[in-house]
Amino acid sequence: MARRTSGGMARRSWGWLVVACLVAAPAWAESEPESEVSLAAGEPVVAADGDRPAAEAAAAEAEPAAASGEPTGETLAAPEPALASEPTPEPAAEPASPEPPTPEQEQTDRVRFKLDVAGEIFAPAGRDAPPVRRPIVVDARFDFLETVRTTESGITARRCYRDAAAEVRVDGASRATRLADDARDISVVLRGTTPAPHLEGGFLSREELDLLETPFDPLLLDRLLPGRSVAVAESWPVAADAAAGLLAIDTIESGGLEATLETVENGEATVKVTGIVDGAADGVPTHVTVEGTVTVNASGDSTAAMLEGPVMRAEVALRERREASHVSPGFDVEARLTAVRTPHADAGRHAAESASGTTAAARVGAGMGSRRQGTGRPGFVWHGDAASRYDLVYDDRWRVIEDGVEGLVMRFVDRGALVAQCSVTALPRAASQSPPSIAEVERDIEKSLAGQFGRIEHSSEAARSDGVRIVRVAVAGRAGDLPFRWIHHVLTDAAGHRLAVTCMLEQSLEKRFGAADRELIDGISLPGNGADSAAETVGAPMGPPDREARVPSESRTP
């Protein structure tokens, strides 16, 4: 029976591997050649046969809302992305993990978390070449005050970070990542069994999000407890959705986690956690082995002990081998993590100081190139161009695979399936009085696509309320033997700053892609219109689709 939890965590889990890709960028320059789809307008694009089954199988799994109608010269509101609705979840085939008590309660603790990783990462180097392999070592540490609030509507947490840092070493190259001063007051919600960290008044960068997300997140540790009295040496299975959340994967195909009460002494219990899991993450297979212990308060005796959360200490060793996906390298690593939770009496004062410091830092950092402000919420990521040529808040299903002087390249991955690819390129500045016309954009596209060009399906021009003009041209054509669709956007602000955004996808995935290109464009801010004008509208009432933990009716492991 396949078990699945989805909600972003698995797509971003073991986030230091994303950092590893950046550290060793030259080594991965030719990663995944069999599924590469180039967005350079003048280059031929041939989709690999190997990509189609996964995408088509996943497309059958969900049917997002169709794209909205085409604008023709109307005035648009300033950036205000509204994401396509999530498909109706599959009915659960087995019960989910037991929910915590619902009476409203609040508790503040200090949590210290350490993660040490060693192993290797690998990526394909070509059809006839062996994978490129690089050694990796990670040293990550976290120290924060966590206030957990449990209500009838679920669990939320506020984390005030004293420290959050990681050092990643790949093949001798080192990169240090630390949570910024203006991003240390973090809110966390549970989307199913996936902890989703976010800022209340802004947006985290992908690097920050990757840093904060780890296996065995402290917010999930209580899901290891049985919720009933148990005797020493008695074992119980950990619910499938909780196990997937703890391991930060999408699907458990076989195996699982099991907990066993080992000792009860002086009001304290020790629980052993073991398991072997085969599943999938990001649409690729993964194999995980787990062995560890957790310590928790207990009442009763060795014949009938009631384990009372929260878990105060966890020591876990993991071994995972995960195949390379469309957006990240594969890895074969061993990890050791330690989490220690202690009650904290001065939480209120520290939280107030943290919030004050965050607000002050946000004020100092106003403007293009600084963190995008606005109503933050889970499922959105901020990207600031290194040269301050644009600013972007986007759906976290877009994954960056290249970020350099020539532009930004992202892939849209929905439930493990590669749906589309996008390039964002800053163009030379133009006279503000003469933004490119539809005819000029159409002519340039037809020339650059050359033999791939088929026909222009639709062209439109619109102006946002912040003064940014957008030319949008949708083109149908062929790449190899497959019908493709290219959607080109050229954005121009009042000061003449220009940005080209091109999305490409197979026509068979058009419905699944929906309005993702429009939502991406809505999140872009250019220097001439200022980041703040876009920031306040990014937090639209409609959030990204909740990808909550659930059990599908059948396996979706490739």
Predicted segments, located by residue:
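Sec-dependent N-terminal signal peptides
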Residues: 2-33
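Signature of exported/secreted
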Residues: 39-46, 73-79, 84-86, 90-388, ...
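Short beta-strand segments that buttress and anchor functional surface loops
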Residues: 271-279, 312-313, 411-413, 471-480
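Short, well-ordered beta-strand elements
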Residues: 310, 422-424, 496-506
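Secretory pathway targeting signatures of secreted, lumenal, and periplasmic proteins
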Residues: 384-387, 391-444, 478-479
